[in-house]
């Protein structure tokens, strides 16, 4: 997910400020916003990466909001625009499929595809046209990136046009809202016509998932999490197992939670990840 050479900034944000606007012209800037005498948020501009890093309580989000590769070197790109990683209590919950090979073939094609990342796919297309072993053709373009922080949490949102080649020219809007209690991800696909919209959540190795009735229960070393999905059209919620990189030249299996919607655009879906309450502790109270 994190590849060098992206033409955007990494912003490191913690909760508490009203609005954060990093200075894109600065280099190595560390900006501190203060509220009522206390440090409210810190924004750190690092080397260009196209990533936003947000932290709230024990939740840690890394969102891919930059171009897939430099315009001068369309290579080593993955079709992963608006993919994200999530850790809770420093334990991976949502992970990246990773890279296990540079050899041409189905494994390399899958690991670079939109379907291999925690983002939205439209009509089985990739958000960036990846071909060969390294190259990229038509690329997703991100616009409208905004980051807001407040007393309750952090919101990051943007839109990309990586599916503009499809009939109806779909646009993918994504908003992450992170608090110390939960992560809410709102996806909106606008455009014209009937399309298949698929949202995938790539779970970390060792994480189990059960799905039924539009909800899912995810169990990881960090605990149990409920996943609820609300959408503007009927959702088919399924789980599957797919190979992910365990190292260069090796793979292992991990679970994927998939939300599939077939409907006329616009399509809106909201996915909420929250920690399950300790039922036994409640019974003792």
Give residue ranges: language-model regions.
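CBM-like, beta-strand-rich accessory domains located in the C-terminal region of large
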Residues: 1-2, 19, 32, 100-285
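Carbohydrate-active enzyme catalytic cores, enriched for enzymes
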Residues: 1-94, 150, 262
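A generic structural motif
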Residues: 67, 99-100
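Short glycine-rich loop/turn motifs that provide flexible caps or phosphate-binding loops at active sites
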Residues: 89, 97, 122
């Amino acid at each position: 997910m994190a590849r060098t050479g992206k033409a955007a900034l990494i912003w490191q944000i913690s909760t508490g400020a009203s609005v954060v606007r990093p200075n894109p012209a600065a280099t190595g800037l560390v900006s501190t916003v203060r509220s009522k005498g206390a440090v409210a948020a810190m924004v750190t501009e690092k080397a260009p990466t196209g990533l936003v890093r947000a932290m709230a309580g024990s939740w840690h989000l890394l969102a891919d909001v930059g171009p897939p590769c430099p315009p001068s070197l369309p290579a080593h790109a993955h079709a992963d625009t608006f993919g994200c990683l999530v850790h809770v209590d420093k334990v991976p919950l949502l992970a990246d499929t990773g890279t296990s090979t540079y050899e041409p073939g189905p494994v390399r094609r899958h690991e670079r595809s939109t379907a291999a990342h925690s983002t939205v796919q439209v009509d089985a297309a990739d958000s960036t046209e990846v071909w060969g072993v390294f190259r990229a053709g038509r690329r997703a373009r991100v616009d409208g990136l905004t980051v807001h922080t407040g007393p309750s949490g952090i919101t990051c949102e943007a839109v990309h046009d990586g599916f503009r080649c499809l009939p109806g020219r779909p646009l993918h809007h994504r908003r992450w809202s992170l608090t110390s209690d939960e992560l809410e991800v709102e996806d909106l696909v606008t455009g014209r016509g009937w399309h298949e919209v698929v949202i995938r959540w790539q779970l970390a190795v060792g994480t189990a998932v059960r799905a039924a009735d539009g909800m899912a229960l995810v169990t990881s070393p960090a605990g149990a999490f409920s996943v609820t999905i609300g959408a503007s059209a009927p959702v088919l919620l399924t789980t599957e197992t797919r190979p992910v990189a365990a190292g260069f030249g090796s793979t292992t299996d991990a679970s994927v939670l998939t939300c599939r919607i077939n409907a006329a655009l616009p399509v809106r879906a909201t996915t909420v990840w929250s920690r399950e309450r300790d039922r036994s502790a409640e019974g003792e109270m």
